[in-house]
Amino acid sequence: MATQDDQTSLRDQLSGLQLAPSDSRTAWHRLETHVQDVELKGRLIIVGDVHGHLPELKNLLQKVSYDKKNGDQLIFVGDLINKGPDSPGVVQLAIDHDALAIRGNNEDRVLAAYSAIKRGEDSKLIEKWKQLAMEAEKTNTEQTVPAESKDDLRSVSRKDLKPYMAESDFGEAASLSEEQIKWLASQPLILRIKLPKEAINSPWNAGTLIVAHGGLVPSIPLEEQDPWAVMNMRGLVYPDAEASTSEAIKADIIKGAKSRVRRYAAFQDASDEEVKAELAKMADTVKNGEGFSGQYKDGLIGFPLESREGDWWIDAWNRWQNSIEDHKQRSIVVYGHDARVGLQIGEESSQVSRYTFGLDSGCAYGRGLAAMVVDKKEDGGLSHEIVKVDAAGEAEDKQEGSS
């Protein structure tokens, strides 16, 4: 069972998973703003993962009667780009409408690809992807790589790590203008919006609305959240020295650790020695995936996973918010990043009052685009509705949300 010292150590390690300061001459477009505070004025139009689908975005804005001149604030939950036909068009629309956005995992990789292009390393990294693809065709990599090189982070070297960016990310980076790249790079990791005190109905009687792409770890302050996790997470596991960690959880912990180091190397232009030091740091944090359980116990702080193994983070967040007696200390999270599950907007999948709303409707896979429209009521409170259009542009009916 995890002790208080174990919990303090894990929290410190989670808070410490940040990119170290680097030379500005070699680090392009790293994440500069962790949390940005936004004032609630007019309606909030919070749009799910667009993934370069400009016609769906235009249809959605038309359906919600978006009007910037009337005070509407357009917000994107990240992943505006990649996988679709017109990422430059989507980004330009966001710029033209003074929209707010957060950095999703796709923006992060494309910005890392742009950094590599600026350093003249794109050809080398693309060639490495081609070599990996050829090797995968010839052999079953999972069977031929020794177990220790996969599971023991201290035995991993830089050449064992895949590039952080996919091959397609370089083409996406090249398709965007300098202005569009700079705009994407300027967006924060998290948006925080203070809600009016007059609201009395759950969940809008909470004190804060948060927009984060992938998820958040309960009990960790926003400023201390691990950026990689905020952009990529779906599940949580908990420290438990007596637990027999499943192979699936262990593999995902190791995968996430390597991905963090790949991100570090991409944005830092890091040396082999610096990458080795980061791998050692991650090894100390994750202990090769041992001693973690997917079973939540009161008081434990979760460790984020990219997969849904263990405890789903939205369940953990909803439990935590419902345990806070003062409603004004509670926080609603609107997020994206989970196309496989799709929209998560109602009470049906939560055993407690919902304080999380997932807006990734699967636009990247032809399943339409959705937005949450948050508006002030006559009594000063708030209400919301979910509006969706399908991939062909034929809008579906509005669904009333909590008021």
What are these regions (language model features)?
Residues N70, S87-E247:
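Active-site neighborhood of divalent metal-dependent phosphoester bond hydrolases
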Residues A2-V91:
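N-terminal active-site segment of His-dependent metallophosphoesterases
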Residues I46, F76, A101-I102, I210, ...:
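Residue-level marker for buried hydrophobic side chains located in beta-strands
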Residues Q4-D23, E39, M231-S403:
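Acidic, His/Gly-rich catalytic cores of divalent-metal-dependent hydrolytic chemistry
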Residues R43-H51, L209-G215, F357-L359:
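Active-site-proximal beta-strand elements of phosphoester/diester hydrolases
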